Amino acid sequence: MKKRWSIVTLMLIFTLVLSACGFGGTGSNGEGKKDSKGKTTLNINIKTEPFSLHPGLANDSVSGGVIRQTFEGLTRINADGEPEEGMASKIETSKDGKTYTFTIRDGVKWSNGDPVTAQDFEYAWKWALDPNNESQYAYQLYYIKGAEAANTGKGSLDDVAVKAVNDKTLKVELNNPTPYFTELTAFYTYMPINEKIAEKNKKWNTNAGDDYVSNGPFKMTAWKHSGSITLEKNDQYWDKDKVKLKKIDMVMINNNNTELKKFQAGELDWAGMPLGQLPTESLPTLKKDGSLHVEPIAGVYWYKFNTEAKPLDNVNIRKALTYSLDRQSIVKNVTQGEQMPAMAAVPPTMKGFEDNKEGYFKDNDVKTAKEYLEKGLKEMGLSKASDLPKIKLSYNTDDAHAKIAQAVQEMWKKNLGVDVELDNSEWNVYIDKLHSQDYQIGRMGWLGDFNDPINFLELFRDKNGGNNDTGWENPEFKKLLNQSQTETDKTKRAELLKKAEGIFIDEMPVAPIYFYTDTWVQDENLKGVIMPGTGEVYFRNAYFK
């Protein structure tokens, strides 16, 4: 989360502006905060309309933030960030590590009372792999034998090696041993879909109602598009006795100053990441009064280059733009959330990639940037920067992204003499632009969908793969990623991934800017929230003391 980004991965992570008169500088409880002891409704902000609340279509942090409360996979992530049994009560692995057999829990049900079966998982995974459904995260299923061939039209869905042996047993065959497969099965692309409902109503996921059924700790009971979402406790959930909240009210406020004010007024119980955002100018005061929470997470903020659009099809132009950025200035003066300048793709929080704190190139290396610019101009038959084709820098509407883009625009003009035009659009419009490569340079964030460095590289394996968006691919890069998936020695595997990252940085289809931190404030009585460190949040064990 696209995480991702994720992550989606992604991703809506930061904002910046707060007027001097708008921040009252209160403590964590906020002025006008009502007594929250023992209450059972959680009020949070998710900023914008989700891209999709279909587990097979979701590819951003907003959608994932809702789905993680309403659905559950064969496994789920616990408070230690580790996978544990979810819908599956038993997980067996073959000696060669390539075959998994999941036993579905007794009595697990959908929110409408239908039994959750192994067939619901087989149906969901094959639905995501069906190329007609255009799932951006289908590649997360490529670990399964036959999955990539089916998704790319070179094979049949019937040959995908996921099989419901019976209602209680799901058998999965992988291409190679994948030690983190039980982390993958907690990710939303691997979550089940009620086959009976989905076949009856192809648009089941577009509104709240009788057909929006889920199997997680909460169920969606209301969805006012672009306004709010209401979740209520799912009494059919197998672990319902540990779910203390009766309701989660999610509002969509795409103004960070307003979000903080509503928190201070007691209208929100949480303000900031990972689902909302704090005004950056409020962070020093919130930190000083002790109410600010800051945690490094496995995530990176970068600018994607459309490598098939001029002048970004020239690697030296891409390098010139990347090397000329002053990341330290951005994190110190703009984002102000203790982020780390990124001169690499994989966050240094990933084991084996600790050296990425330093990265592959110097920050703010204007001298080298000018050399790359001169070389790129010569290759294009141009004499000066002003001769370059028009460049547009795009981002989704948000104060934070706007401020970062303005800073970058100024750096490129000052350091290289390159003029860029800024372009913003609402999230759903923007993400469509990226996926269709209708852009030149576009901001994006990527959060680890699971705790492995391949997260930040594999989305660029194939130029037409979901969430790549850059039009870039490299045969040697792809070869190294494939080798890493068969290498069982952890040290050797990390070396393969480092080599792949080296190729990626050398060809520069993205300009990394900073590694993320989560910054937020919360009601002092709110406890039990699970934040594993990869940018997601779970409220199934949350409560007000």
Curated annotation (Swiss-Prot):
Family of this protein: Belongs to the bacterial solute-binding protein 5 family.
Signal peptide feature range: 1-20
Name listed for the protein in its UniProt record: Oligopeptide-binding protein OppA
Membrane-crossing segments per the record: none
Top-level taxonomy: Bacteria, Bacillati, Bacillota, Bacilli, Bacillales
Provenance organism: Bacillus subtilis (strain 168)
Keyword hit for Transport: yes
InterPro entries named among the record's database cross-references: Peptide/Ni-bd (IPR030678), SBP_5 (IPR039424), SBP_5_CS (IPR023765), SBP_5_dom (IPR000914)
Positions where Phosphothreonine occurs in the chain: 470
GO molecular function, a single term: peptide transmembrane transporter activity
UniProt topology in membrane: Lipid-anchor
